[in-house]
């Protein structure tokens, strides 16, 4: 996609401000699809008619978490197993004069506009309906690089209510339209075509999810590091960066993005390999003489300490680590790397040699404009307690582990 001349984010925002549609495409490593996106404030019957005729996808409306709470838009399901964690709520129709079955272009346009109208309330809608709201993560594309977050971000940047219409664009044969077809759409209808990657870069230059709170020095058993504490504007958690040497020179930097594991990092739990990975990463950075370890407060792959301990109990009953999370209603891995990416950007890191076995982490960081020039494994020899855990991460979560684990169990 780098050889294609995409439109600027500024030009797309101006079109949305003027009530026009834009085409937004995401990364080839993710859904690799294009969506029509517009601000809910400017939706018309003509626009809905055009979208249903030309795009043929599902009409959805992206709303903020706050707006979803105001309108009591509850999750469509309690256990979301969507591949890309698309956060659907229960579908709705507007309760308003002239709205009948909810399916006409007038009915759907009215529902969409009312979802963005601050005067609307929970009782303004019937459930289920013909419009599908989606809850965007707080922080937008800086937290999740999806069309849902892009729709909210673009509407907000255009000075509209942070509620956006989006619809996937399908090919004539019903398959997903990819970049060549989307370029034809752009030329045929005179629409702007932008990428979520460019929107992330635009917001990274203008908006911050974290700020430096304090800097200090920390002598450790592995060496002395500069320690920088960050405060998140989104969840108000404190995250840390252990820094060795000059990491802002432009040369590739040895990097580890490590999520908190109190049981492993602090108490040397044998259930996981987290504590040993943390120690190994710090040793490797010290030996290198230059590098960063970002420590994110995402306990238990994002489910928190209490739920992690509940998952331990389920594992003792015979469930593996993925099944235990699913039994509790969670995806196998709820971590996001937007905050970690902003910390690395703040430190001046642009190219990295990433210490990880996790392919999701590679994709997650690359989505924020950071170049991973090399992936280095961080393998820990299994013990009799965590061998099945490591096998599960390899076999079910795609972790690139080539340790002396044996398939089975």
Swiss-Prot record:
CDD domains: GTP_cyclohydro2 (cd00641)
Enzyme Commission number(s): 4.1.99.12, 3.5.4.25
UniProt binding sites for Zn(2+): 261, 272, 274
Alphabetical list of Pfam families matching this protein: DHBP_synthase, GTP_cyclohydro2
Keywords: GTP-binding, Hydrolase, Lyase, Magnesium, Manganese, Metal-binding, Multifunctional enzyme, Nucleotide-binding, Riboflavin biosynthesis, Zinc
GO BP terms: riboflavin biosynthetic process
Catalytic activity entry: D-ribulose 5-phosphate = (2S)-2-hydroxy-3-oxobutyl phosphate + formate + H(+); GTP + 4 H2O = 2,5-diamino-6-hydroxy-4-(5-phosphoribosylamino)-pyrimidine + formate + 2 phosphate + 3 H(+)
Cross-referenced NCBIfam families: PRK00393.1 (NF001591), PRK09311.1 (NF006803), ribA (TIGR00505), ribB (TIGR00506)
Gene Ontology molecular-function annotations: 3,4-dihydroxy-2-butanone-4-phosphate synthase activity; GTP binding; GTP cyclohydrolase II activity; magnesium ion binding; manganese ion binding; zinc ion binding
Highest taxon, organism lineage: Bacteria
Cofactor: Mg(2+); Mn(2+); Zn(2+)
Role of this protein: Catalyzes the conversion of D-ribulose 5-phosphate to formate and 3,4-dihydroxy-2-butanone 4-phosphate. Catalyzes the conversion of GTP to 2,5-diamino-6-ribosylamino-4(3H)-pyrimidinone 5'-phosphate (DARP), formate and pyrophosphate.
Catalytic center residues: 333, 335
Residues with site note (Essential for DHBP synthase activity): 130, 168
One GO CC term on file: cytosol
Binding site for Mg(2+) 1: 31
UniProt: D-ribulose 5-phosphate binding residues: 30-31, 35, 144-148, 168
Region (DHBP synthase): 1-205
Protein name: Riboflavin biosynthesis protein RibBA
């Amino acid at each position: 996609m780098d050889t294609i001349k995409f439109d600027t984010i500024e030009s797309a925002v101006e079109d949305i401000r003027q009530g026009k549609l834009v085409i937004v495409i995401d990364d080839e490593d993710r859904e690799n699809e294009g969506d029509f996106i517009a601000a809910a404030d400017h939706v018309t019957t003509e626009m809905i008619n055009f979208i249903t005729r030309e795009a043929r996808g599902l009409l959805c409306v992206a709303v903020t978490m706050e707006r979803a709470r105001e309108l009591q838009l509850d999750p469509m399901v309690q256990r979301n197993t969507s591949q890309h964690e698309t956060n659907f709520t229960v579908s709705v129709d507007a309760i308003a004069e002239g709205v009948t079955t909810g399916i006409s272009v007038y009915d759907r346009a009215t529902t969409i506009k009312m979802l963005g109208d601050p005067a609307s309330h929970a009782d303004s809608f019937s459930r289920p309906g013909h419009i599908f709201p989606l809850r965007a993560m707080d922080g937008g594309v800086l937290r999740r690089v999806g069309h849902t977050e892009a729709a909210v971000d673009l509407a907000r940047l255009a000075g509209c209510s942070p509620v956006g219409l989006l619809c996937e664009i399908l090919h004539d044969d019903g398959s997903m339209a990819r970049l060549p077809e989307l370029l034809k759409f752009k030329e045929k209808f005179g629409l702007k075509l932008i990428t979520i990657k460019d929107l992330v870069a635009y917001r990274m230059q203008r908006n911050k999810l974290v700020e430096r709170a304090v800097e200090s020095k920390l002598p450790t058993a592995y060496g002395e590091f500069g320690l920088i504490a960050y405060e998140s504007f989104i969840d108000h958690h404190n995250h840390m960066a252990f820094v060795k040497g000059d990491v802002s020179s432009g040369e590739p930097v040895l990097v580890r993005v490590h999520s908190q594991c109190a049981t492993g990092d602090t108490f040397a739990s044998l259930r996981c390999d987290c504590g040993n990975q943390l120690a190994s990463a710090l040793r490797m950075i010290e030996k290198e003489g230059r590098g960063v370890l970002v420590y994110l407060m995402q306990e238990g792959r994002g489910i928190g300490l209490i739920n992690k301990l509940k998952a331990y109990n389920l594992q003792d009953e015979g469930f593996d680590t993925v099944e235990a999370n699913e039994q509790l209603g969670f995806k196998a891995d709820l971590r996001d790397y937007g905050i970690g990416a902003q910390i690395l950007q703040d430190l001046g890191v642009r190219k990295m040699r990433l210490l990880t076995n996790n392919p999701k982490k590679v994709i997650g960081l690359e989505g924020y404009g950071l170049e991973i020039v090399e992936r280095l494994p961080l393998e820990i020899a299994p013990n009799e307690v965590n061998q099945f855990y490591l096998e599960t991460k390899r076999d079910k979560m795609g972790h690139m582990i080539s340790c002396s684990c044996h398939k089975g169990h």
